[in-house]
């Protein structure tokens, strides 16, 4: 191995290290590769040190096997890059840190640290790992060629402090974004020079570095000498680490508010958040000002949704000054776990439309699959972005805390070279955790199609064709061609194996497929597509919860696993499986159904029945107020639930599954449901309104109208002062009521009570066609309330509780904008009138009540499981803590 020791001039020139000590570097490694005409792709440089596990010197010293770095280099020099000289291409790969071997590797680390990926005995001075046996999947091949790597080591970076800082981040996966290019060169025997540069970072926003790396690669390839090329790498590494990204990392780490922003697709609200003079942005993210600096003194500016870091403190030694004028930009809205620039309609929707039928066909007998996606026409950047898009909608890439199915994450490999096939086989064979797991692998080589033992489904993007692996013994395809050709392994690769493109039964259709086809035909933007997928996830989750209540539930059921098995939609959004969000969705659904039941002209209720319904509505609203009063995070989670909830009047037949759903039209159902909803709410249809698509109607925000709808039941003419509000100002009385409304027994009755949907003879939710006419519910309910003082007092209490709930939401910067945008004019007027009546007169008591409500919910800190048994245990703990808090408060009084 060639080893270049940096002279003292590098240490003297690297004065940035004194100013920027890299406590937590933005970029952990910068590496380069090139294509050697004799050796193929090779690693050329690694900085600031060789990556653990990819140390060329140690491998050659042991056994001459250098395929580990060769496989890494093959990812950096992708196939066919020489076909487009002067046009850069991008690949993405991840290195996972193995705490047991203290090395990085290309495949995820097994849960059991005793099983890793290297058959070689490690000879290290560290007694904790000496003589440990591990299997290296990347090092599976016998490679006899020598590989040469220049390991750049800066003495100052090798100090103990830097080593400690490096160890602190070593346990995180490193995301590498790699830029490769080809430059024609007549002096080269190949006629061209192929080189690449990659940076490894623990940040999932690694695509933000793309533009800078592209420019640096151009300078690197034009460097007149090898020394100048290495200096460019050093300068780039120091420049990217000369800024402090704490601010954007903090903004992205606020998951609850990010989920709300992700669910907002109205540009006027986004503009309000980021550009309004009231500084909503400052309130949300606790930003002191729009003209600020990082801790190193670099200027940080804000532009629309972007935060821009300027390299104002860095002094380049080799890089040209113009490069420093390009700011590093990050979107403050973290729309996906991995930020990418991709067209979901072009690739992802077509994939879902083709793949979901195969999942439905497999049914519950297949709990795992391995998927290979191949394209020779897409650029590697588009291919990687496609695979990462699929990773985003399954939320299982790299260090994501959520699992996809039964506690296991999916293996996501954005781009895999053919040289890694044996490594993949070894990984699957040696990893017991992989049994029952999922894999999504991107390739640009059709040979993968014939490797039957590594895939269950193969998708040819270029041809738009899916292949299903039907071989009973995938590792031994018995083909006629094999008999004729013989056992030659090279020729055997091209045998046509047992796979098929069998058509899927058209009757196996779910709601997702109907939406996929409609989205493709109408060509909506990515925000609308993601909104539809999220709304569908919530809608089907709500129906699944209803179904689970009607049958016996296993004690250790995982709701997310049940959802994946039941709907087979591929995509999933874990934030909706949070207990608080689930409970919010359920309460919204119960409130929606109660209101519909009260205003339904097809049913006649006695005064007692109406009072019972009103009591249930009051319990629901009180429960919601108690929940959002706990913390700002709870408000944000509730707002996110509201933004993604669809009332069952819009799509009541969404709970149909299988054959039934194929016989109705999504468009006609949604349009009829929208008209019924407006009629029920008393909202007049605008004769001059713009005709919108069914998708736009489906993704409209209805929840805030549902919350405020009851306020219209108490007419202004009644004008009665509400005597009950006086008692609410007394601390003990209010606390007692809150505690009673949130007792475990009442909560379980509320949660397990069947939905109050009007059921048909078959027990299914009745469709829109069964209701030929929807009338304004206010005109039906208001006379009933005025006819009974008892009911009117009960209704007044509900109005007061609703007003407090809406006011609590309005106090949040985002909640204020959402209510202003999505509350219909008539309902907004009713809310403002109610707020003037209650809040302005009882401002002090409201604030006191809010504080008490927050303190009364002491169980907010209790972690709750998505399992049924775990959820019940968590609720019991909450109830016990609430009763304890109540007793303590009463003693103090």
From Swiss-Prot:
Q: Where is this region: Disordered?
A: 841-893
The segment(s) forming the dDENN domain are 494-640
Note, other: Present with 768 molecules/cell in log phase SD medium.
What are the uDENN domain coordinates in residue numbering?
A: 28-335
Q: What induces it?
A: Mainly expressed in dividing cells, but not in stationary phase cells (at protein level).
InterPro entries listed in its UniProt record = Actin_polarity_regulatory, Afi1_N, Tripartite_DENN
Where does the cDENN domain start and stop, copy by copy? 365-492
The alphabetized UniProt keywords are: Coiled coil, Cytoplasm
Free-text function comment from the UniProt entry: Involved in actin patch polarization. Required for maintaining a proper budding pattern in yeast cells. Required for proper polarized localization of the ADP-ribosylation factor ARF3 at the plasma membrane.
Biological process per Gene Ontology, one example term: cellular bud site selection
Q: What protein does this entry describe?
A: ARF3-interacting protein 1
Keyword Metal-binding among UniProt keywords:
no
What species does this protein belong to?
Saccharomyces cerevisiae (strain ATCC 204508 / S288c)
Annotated Polar residues bias:
863-893
Write down the superkingdom of origin.
Eukaryota
**Family of the protein in this entry:** Belongs to the AFI1/mesA family.
């Amino acid at each position: 191995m060639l080893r270049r020791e940096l002279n003292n001039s590098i240490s003297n020139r690297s004065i940035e290290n004194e100013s920027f000590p890299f406590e937590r570097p933005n970029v952990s490694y910068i590496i380069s590769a090139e294509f050697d005409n004799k050796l193929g792709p090779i690693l050329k440089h690694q900085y600031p040190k060789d990556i653990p596990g990819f140390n060329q010197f140690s491998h050659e010293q042991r056994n001459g096997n250098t395929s580990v770095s060769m496989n890494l280099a093959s990812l950096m020099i992708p196939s066919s890059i020489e076909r487009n000289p002067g046009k850069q291409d991008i690949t993405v790969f991840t290195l996972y840190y193995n705490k047991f071997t203290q090395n990085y590797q290309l495949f995820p680390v097994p849960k059991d640290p005793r099983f890793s990926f290297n058959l070689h005995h490690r000879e290290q001075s560290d007694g904790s790992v000496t003589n440990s046996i591990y299997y290296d999947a990347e090092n599976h091949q016998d490679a006899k060629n020598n590989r040469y790597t220049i390991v750049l080591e800066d003495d100052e970076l090798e100090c103990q402090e830097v080593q400690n800082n490096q160890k602190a981040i070593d346990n995180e996966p490193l995301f590498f974004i790699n830029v490769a290019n080809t430059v024609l060169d007549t002096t080269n025997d190949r006629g061209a020079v192929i080189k690449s540069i990659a940076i490894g970072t623990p940040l999932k926003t690694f695509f933000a570095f793309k533009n800078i790396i592209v420019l640096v690669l151009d300078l690197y390839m034009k460097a007149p000498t090898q020394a100048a090329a290495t200096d460019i790498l050093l300068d780039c590494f120091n420049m990217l680490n000369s800024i402090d990204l704490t601010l954007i990392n903090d903004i992205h780490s606020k998951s609850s508010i990010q989920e709300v922003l992700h669910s907002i697709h109205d540009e006027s609200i986004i503009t309000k958040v980021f550009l309004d003079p009231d500084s909503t942005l400052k309130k949300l993210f606790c930003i002191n000002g729009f003209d600020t600096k990082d801790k190193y003194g670099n200027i940080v500016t804000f532009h629309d949704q972007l935060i821009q870091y300027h390299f104002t403190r860095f002094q380049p030694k080799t890089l040209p000054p113009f490069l420093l004028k390009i700011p590093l930009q990050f979107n403050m809205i973290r729309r996906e776990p991995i930020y990418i620039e991709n067209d979901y309609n072009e690739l992802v929707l077509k994939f879902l439309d083709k793949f979901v039928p195969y999942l439905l066909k497999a049914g519950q007998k297949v709990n795992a699959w391995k998927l290979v996606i191949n394209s020779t026409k897409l650029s590697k950047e588009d291919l990687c972005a496609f695979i990462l898009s699929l990773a985003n909608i399954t939320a299982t890439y790299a260090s994501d805390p959520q699992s996809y199915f039964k506690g296991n994450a999916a293996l996501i490999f954005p781009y895999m070279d053919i040289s890694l096939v044996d490594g993949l086989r070894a990984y699957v064979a040696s990893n017991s955790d992989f049994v029952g797991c999922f894999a999504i692998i991107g390739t640009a080589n059709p040979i993968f199609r014939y490797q039957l033992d590594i895939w269950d489904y193969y998708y040819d993007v270029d041809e738009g064709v899916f292949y299903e692996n039907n071989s009973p013994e995938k590792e031994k395809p018995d083909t006629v061609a094999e008999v004729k050709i013989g056992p030659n392994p090279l020729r055997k690769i091209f045998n046509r194996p047992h796979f098929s493109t069998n058509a899927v039964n058209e009757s196996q259709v779910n709601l997702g497929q109907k939406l996929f086809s409609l989205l493709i035909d109408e060509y909506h933007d990515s925000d609308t597509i993601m909104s539809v997928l999220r709304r569908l996830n919530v809608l089907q989750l709500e129906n699944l919860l209803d179904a689970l209540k009607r049958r016996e539930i296993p004690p250790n059921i995982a709701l997310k696993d049940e959802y994946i098995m039941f709907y087979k939609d591929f995509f999933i959004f874990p934030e909706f499986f949070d207990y608080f969000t689930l409970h919010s969705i359920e309460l919204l659904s119960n409130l929606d159904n109660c209101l519909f039941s009260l205003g339904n002209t097809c049913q006649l209720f006695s005064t007692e029945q109406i009072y019972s319904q009103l009591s249930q509505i009051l319990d629901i609203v009180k429960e919601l107020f108690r929940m959002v009063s706990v913390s700002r995070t709870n408000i944000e989670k509730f707002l996110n639930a509201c933004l993604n909830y669809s009332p069952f009047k819009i799509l009541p037949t969404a709970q149909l599954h299988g054959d039934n759903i194929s016989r109705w039209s999504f468009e006609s159902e949604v349009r009829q449901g929208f008209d019924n909803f407006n009629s029920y709410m008393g909202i007049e249809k605008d004769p001059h309104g713009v005709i919108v698509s069914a998708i736009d109607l489906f993704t409209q925000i209805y929840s805030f109208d549902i919350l405020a709808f009851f306020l219209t039941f108490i007419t202004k003419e009644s004008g009665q002062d509400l005597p009950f509000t006086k008692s609410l100002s007394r601390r003990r009385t209010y606390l007692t009521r809150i505690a009673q409304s949130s007792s475990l027994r009442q909560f379980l009755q509320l949660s397990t009570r069947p939905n109050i949907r009007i059921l048909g003879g078959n027990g299914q939710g009745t469709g829109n066609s069964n209701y030929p006419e929807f009338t304004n519910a206010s005109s039906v309910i208001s006379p009933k309330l005025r006819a009974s003082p008892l009911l009117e007092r009960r209704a007044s209490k509900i109005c007061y509780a609703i007003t407090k709930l809406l006011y609590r939401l309005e106090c949040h910067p985002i909640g204020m904008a959402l209510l202003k945008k999505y509350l219909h004019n008539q309902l907004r007027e009713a809310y403002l009138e109610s707020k003037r009546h209650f809040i302005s007169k009882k401002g002090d008591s409201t604030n006191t009540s809010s504080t008490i409500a927050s303190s009364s919910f002491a169980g907010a800190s209790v972690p709750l499981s998505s399992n049924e048994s775990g959820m019940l245990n968590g609720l019991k703990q909450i109830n016990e803590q609430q009763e304890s808090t109540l007793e303590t408060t009463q003693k103090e009084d």
